[in-house]
Each structure stands twice: as structure tokens, then as C-alpha cells.
Amino acid sequence: MAGGRLGPTVTLYDSADFGSLHLSNRVVMAPLTRTRADAEGVPTAIIEEYYRQRAGQGLIISEGVWPVLEGKSYPGQPGIVTPAQIEGWRRVADAVHAEGGTIVM
């Protein structure tokens, strides 16, 4: 692409590298509260499908999760503490990766 005074022109749909992350485009999905986890804070199939459907974004930032038991803020908020929660997020990440997407927490 043609360069200007500020450097080469890039578009929203150009790929980008951020450290070890390679993004297929520069569209970033901001974290959105979904309140779809079960009573124990385990991501459900609905959460998995929600993120899978959005895997075409360059980068997905997951919704807020509680990293310690005392950190749960509201009903339906997922956690990342227990083995079941970790496995739930593993399924979410695998679904996004299967569609060619990148997700971070």
C-alpha cells in the first residue's frame, strides 16, 4: 500500500501481530457481560456457542471472570478457579480456535 507522512496505510482487515498473537484482522471484540454461566460459575454451552459465532473477529476479549472464589460479583458470572470452570473455558477456547479465532481473558 502507498505510504504517507505517517507511514504505510493499514486497514481494519489487515492482519496484525502482537507479541506471540497473530490476528487475522484488527477487529477487537470488547468484553461484554453475558451472565450465562451456571450457578457454580461454569461456562455453559450457550457461552461456548456465543464465542464460537464471533470467532471471525481479529481478537475476542472474554467477559469478566472471577479469578478467586471471593471475586464473584453477580449471578451468572463465570469463574476460572475450579477444574470444572477451567474445563468450561477450555471448551470455549477450543471452539473459537476451531473457527480460526483468537480469544484472551
Positions of PLM-derived features:
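Flavin-dependent oxidoreductase catalytic cores
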Residues: 1-104
